[in-house]
């Protein structure tokens, strides 16, 4: 564009001169002018070419600078990793995740690489997809938790034995934050497995992402239908009786974009056991977990909704205590008893109303409660709705916090009004108190977990990264100034809770 502009200016300037020459010399002078114009045009073209060449050189230099910056970043990350490793005196493994500079978000997962090192040796390497997870924790906690999928090089799901766990593709890195003992989830999952109820396997790791040390994490299995997790049949069109995994919860992650009609359905009963009316302000929502909301077929929805409806109708009926006509026809009572005791021993403030899973196998499979999930604000680590007190029943949440947005289903108060169910609780409590639920056994677990973290320096490095000892983090009831303080509070709370339950269970 500039070349044409210059050419026109020159022509306009020279045309008057052409009109002044004599006819005799006209041809010679016109030829001379043409040569001058050609020379000027050549110069202008050369200038433009020079500019293009210069711009190309600038682009090349910019790319070189970008490459050098990436190399510098990689070296800095390596130095950080080296510094972190030199500060470690740990027999526990360390996970290193590299996203190539991409930011980890909540949906969709981004591609990354994962290495597990132990004693500075790489023992595993995987391609992964990674995203943020959790609802409340994402909003309130600086230390994030992550959902992982192990992938092949094309980005497709790949089952692997991550960390020595049974082969699967879906994993979670839980970052304890408000729980400053770092063990509440691990403790209750261990107790569940110890009494024969599957809960996610757990292992402590340290985590570094893109060269930044993130502290102590727990590698966990995501709740899924799998022979090594929730061992139920895959539902199909030939047999729609199971298996199913359902949950009672609020929406999180991608589920926030869906209505309850897409994700699940609402109970016909309110939390107090009355049939809902248009004026009912409180409701219980059942969400599809397996098959999930995107995959479940209409006939499968109809089947499992009707099964839950029949169970609730039987439980709400006058014949609910009858072995044949009542609720026992639909549920595995022993699993309900164990689920109840695990939630009560920890006084989980979310018990029965959030992160509450239950499942049904095919054919004549009944409804089973579990696996348990998300206990980081249990064992006295909640300052609302009496979650901090070691006395009181968790299942009576509705009487304490009736205005809360998510209440406990009527199931539990109704079950606890049946002498048969109460008898099963007393029997199981008495059995477990001599074994896995004995005060000595539970406190030994607490001490073993603490020693594991302490001897490997994980408290020191975690709280150097997250300097929150002595600081209130929602929803702390107790704020200890040290790890010793936090564990003293936990041990005292557990002993008080067990003593209260001994008396309370006997009086059911």
Regions found by a protein language model. Give the residues of each.
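Bacterial N-terminal signal peptides that target proteins for export
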Residues: 1-10
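Internal "kinase-insert"/substrate-recognition segments embedded within catalytic cores
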Residues: 154-155, 166-168, 175, 195-198, ...
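Short, solvent-exposed loop/turn and secondary-structure capping segments
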Residues: 107-108, 159-162, 184-185, 217-219, ...
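C-terminal motif of bacterial Sec signal peptides marking the signal peptidase cleavage site
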Residues: 19-22
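Middle-to-C-terminal accessory/interaction subdomains
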Residues: 92-93, 103, 126-127, 135-137, ...
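Conserved NTP-binding catalytic cores of kinases and kinase-like/nucleotidyltransferase enzymes
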Residues: 83-182, 187
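Extended alpha-helical stalk/coiled-coil segments
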Residues: 24-84
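Short, well-structured beta-strand/strand-turn elements
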Residues: 195-206, 348
């Amino acid at each position: 564009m500039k070349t044409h502009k210059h050419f026109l200016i020159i022509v306009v300037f020279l045309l008057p001169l052409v009109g002044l020459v004599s006819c005799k010399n006209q041809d010679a002078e016109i030829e001379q002018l043409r040569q001058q114009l050609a020379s000027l045009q050549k110069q202008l073209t050369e200038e433009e070419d020079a500019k293009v060449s210069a711009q190309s050189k600038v682009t090349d230099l910019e790319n070189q600078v970008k490459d050098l910056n990436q190399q510098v970043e990689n070296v800095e990350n390596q130095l950080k990793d080296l510094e972190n490793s030199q500060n470690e005196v740990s027999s526990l493994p360390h996970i290193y995740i590299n996203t190539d500079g991409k930011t980890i978000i909540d949906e969709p997962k981004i591609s990354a690489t994962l290495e597990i090192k132990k004693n500075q040796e790489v023992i595993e390497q995987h391609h992964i997809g990674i995203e943020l997870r959790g609802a409340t924790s994402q909003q309130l906690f600086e230390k994030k938790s992550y959902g992982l999928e192990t992938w092949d090089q094309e980005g497709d799901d790949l089952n692997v034995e991550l960390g020595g766990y049974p082969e699967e593709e879906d994993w979670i890195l839980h970052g304890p934050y408000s729980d400053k003992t770092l063990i509440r989830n691990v403790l209750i999952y261990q107790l569940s497995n110890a009494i024969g109820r599957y809960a996610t396997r757990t292992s402590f790791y340290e985590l570094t992402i893109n060269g930044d040390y993130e502290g102590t994490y727990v590698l966990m299995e995501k709740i899924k239908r799998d022979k090594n997790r929730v061992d139920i049949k895959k539902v199909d069109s030939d047999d729609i009786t199971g298996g199913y995994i359902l949950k009672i919860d609020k929406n999180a992650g991608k589920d926030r974009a869906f209505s309850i009609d897409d994700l699940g359905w609402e109970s016909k009963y309110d939390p107090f056991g009355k049939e809902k009316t248009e004026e009912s302000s409180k409701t219980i929502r059942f969400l599809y977990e397996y098959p999930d909301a995107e995959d479940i077929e209409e006939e499968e929805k109809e089947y499992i909704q009707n099964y839950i409806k029949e169970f609730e109708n039987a439980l709400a009926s006058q014949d609910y205590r009858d072995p044949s006509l009542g609720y026992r026809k639909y549920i595995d009572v022993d699993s309900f008893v164990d689920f109840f005791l695990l939630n009560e021993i920890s006084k989980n403030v979310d018990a029965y109303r959030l992160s509450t899973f239950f499942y049904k196998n095919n054919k004549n499979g009944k409804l089973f409660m579990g696996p348990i999930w998300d206990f980081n604000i249990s064992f006295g680590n909640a300052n609302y709705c009496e979650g901090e007190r070691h006395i009181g029943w968790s299942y009576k949440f509705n009487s304490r916090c009736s205005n809360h947005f998510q209440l406990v289903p009527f199931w539990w108060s109704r079950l606890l009004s049946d002498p048969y169910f109460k008898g099963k609780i007393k029997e199981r409590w008495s059995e477990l108190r001599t074994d896995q639920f004995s005060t000595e056994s539970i406190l030994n677990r607490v001490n073993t977990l603490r020693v594991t973290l302490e001897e490997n320096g994980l408290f020191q490095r975690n709280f150097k990264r997250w300097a929150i000892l002595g600081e209130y983090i929602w929803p702390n009831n107790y704020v200890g100034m040290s790890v010793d303080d936090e564990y003293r509070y936990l041990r005292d709370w557990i002993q008080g809770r067990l003593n209260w339950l001994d008396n309370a269970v006997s009086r059911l």
